Amino acid sequence: MALLALIIEPDPLLHEVSEAVAGLSDEKRVFLDDMLETMYHCGGIGLAAVQVGVLERIIVVDVPVGKEWHSSPLNHVGYKSSGGPYYFVNPEIIEFSQNLVPADEGCLSLPEQHYEIIRPDAVVVKYLNYDGEECLLKANGWLARCIQHEMDHLNGRLYVSHLSKLKHDLAIKKAAEIKKRHSEAD
């Protein structure tokens, strides 16, 4: 396995819509493993392919068991709230909970920043797994939040797009300053 280079905002690639994956080859599975290793190395709980420079509809997620939720979501029977790793190829959310909850989010592509984002507390997602099998996952809590966050990336959106224009613009400006500071340090 190999570590992949992380794309940091501002970068136009992060605002592109990712393309569907035609099929799962052994080469694609190596890429999935590399994504997961990169996510772990960077301390994340989710990663989208576009964040490592590949415009394909792929995300990996691994939410630690027992990760605290910052509010009291409904307990959805039959839904998973943590666990993994999950490999989502061509994921599609087919159902959103009507219950919206706030929680602080961060992003590997916007380092050193966290903002409160309001999202549905549960989703049902259809996807292909690591073996190319079609699956359906009912997720709530941090798992649902992470899936939604990563799927925003596949649609060319960053989580800060859920903020007011003022907060969004400040977050992007701060990201540019952080990226510049990190590149000067290298």
UniProtKB/Swiss-Prot annotation:
Fe cation binds at C107, H149, H153. Its EC number is 3.5.1.88. The active site is at E150. It catalyses: N-terminal N-formyl-L-methionyl-[peptide] + H2O = N-terminal L-methionyl-[peptide] + formate. Keywords: Hydrolase, Iron, Metal-binding, Protein biosynthesis. One of its GO terms (molecular function) is metal ion binding. InterPro entries: Peptide_deformylase, Peptide_deformylase_sf. Binds 1 Fe(2+) ion. Its cofactor is Fe(2+). It is an enzyme of class 3 (hydrolase). SUPFAM superfamilies: Peptide deformylase. GO terms for biological process: translation. Pfam families: Pep_deformylase. CDD domains: Pep_deformylase. Removes the formyl group from the N-terminal Met of newly synthesized proteins. Requires at least a dipeptide for an efficient rate of reaction. N-terminal L-methionine is a prerequisite for activity but the enzyme has broad specificity at other positions. Belongs to the polypeptide deformylase family. This is Peptide deformylase.
